[in-house]
Amino acid sequence: INPLMKIKNIPLLLMLFLVSCKNEPAKEKFSYERIQEEVKKIESAEQTIIVLNSNDLMLFDKTSLSAKAGKNIRLTLNHTGKIGKEFMGHNFVLLKKDVDVDDFAILALDFKENEYIPENNDFIVHTKMLGGGESDTINFTIEEPGIYTYVCTFPGHYQIMQGELTIE
């Protein structure tokens, strides 16, 4: 081996050594527990305010929301994680009653350029796709009482990230 090659490798070996000696605890596999929190909502004569959080573990912090029929709903979706929307995007899509969630989510896969929102009439309202640290607020009203399903349409998320909005 050429002695000059040995000298060129010294900085590389030194850098590898320093990186490997970093004094950080070993990363452990994560675990999580789904906790049902009481829905934080504020009702006034004019509107119901709902704050829904999503995170890098592909979870909404609430799976059950409620509001009154005919009353304005102001919903804010927060992505409390750190991963960008290209890899861990989240949105809130409120489906019309009796829409098949699986069929809707599979169709949504074909609409990447539209933030995974199909160009059909199977949903009532949606937020934009959010990356870590982003938020979006939407305002809407539902006249008909019933139970409406909401989902995140980012690929692979809808099976875990869904819940129900009960309109009384």
Q: Model-derived features: where do they sit?
A:
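Short, Lys/Arg-enriched N-terminal segments with co-localized hydrophobic residues
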Residues: 1-4
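N-terminal edge beta-strand
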Residues: 43-72
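The feature marks short-to-medium sequence segments in extracytoplasmic or secretory-pathway proteins
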Residues: 90-120
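Sec-dependent signal peptide recognition
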Residues: 6-13
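Extracellular/periplasmic metallocenter environments
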Residues: 27-37, 78, 122-168
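Beta-strand cores of secreted/periplasmic/IMS beta-sandwich domains, seen most often
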Residues: 63-87, 93-94, 136-144, 149, ...
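Bacterial signal peptide processing site
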Residues: 22-24
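C-terminal motif of bacterial Sec signal peptides marking the signal peptidase cleavage site
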Residues: 18-20
